[in-house]
Amino acid sequence: MMDNKRIGTYFERKMCNLLNNQGWWAHFIEPKQNGSQPFDLIAVKNGRALAIDCKTCVNSRFSMDRLEDNQICAFEKWLRCGNDMPYIAVEHKDDIYMIPYDYLKNNKSVKLEDLQWAKWGVLPV
């Protein structure tokens, strides 16, 4: 059985491959030795650049509390620099939800089953 770190890394790599298969240039950002990183992936396509943090979730709710302070600071600076909205890619059961950062920030906690519009393949990311 994989530990949480390996499960997370596996999903980050999977998400990078999914984006690459959809024509994005996607790059996994390696964590620093202390484990910190601003977000997990950067993806670029047709002049759009996306910052994406990948999370796995075993229950049906996802909370803003799952984002670390350095990730929130990085997303806020990303936006101040005039970039597109960052996303949190959440894997739950067999689905991936692409949750816009501002949506999670405004709602604090979301029930994943209520986000059918954010499922991978539905949201035009």
Predicted regions and their residues:
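Acidic-basic catalytic patches of nuclease active cores, encompassing PD-(D/E)XK
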Residues: 1-32, 96
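Active-site metal-binding core of divalent-cation-utilizing nuclease and nuclease-like domains
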Residues: 25-47
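Short connector loops at helix/strand junctions that flank enzyme active sites
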Residues: 36-38, 47-51, 70, 81-83
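Conserved catalytic cores of phosphodiester-cleaving nucleases, focusing on short active-site segments
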Residues: 41-43, 47-60
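Active-site-adjacent loop/helix micro-motif of nuclease/hydrolase catalytic cores
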Residues: 58-72
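Mixed-charge (Asp/Glu-Lys/Arg
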Residues: 73-76, 107, 124-125
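Nucleic-acid nuclease catalytic cores
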Residues: 76-104
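Charged phosphate-binding loop/patch that engages nucleotide di/tri-phosphates or the phosphate backbone
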Residues: 109-125
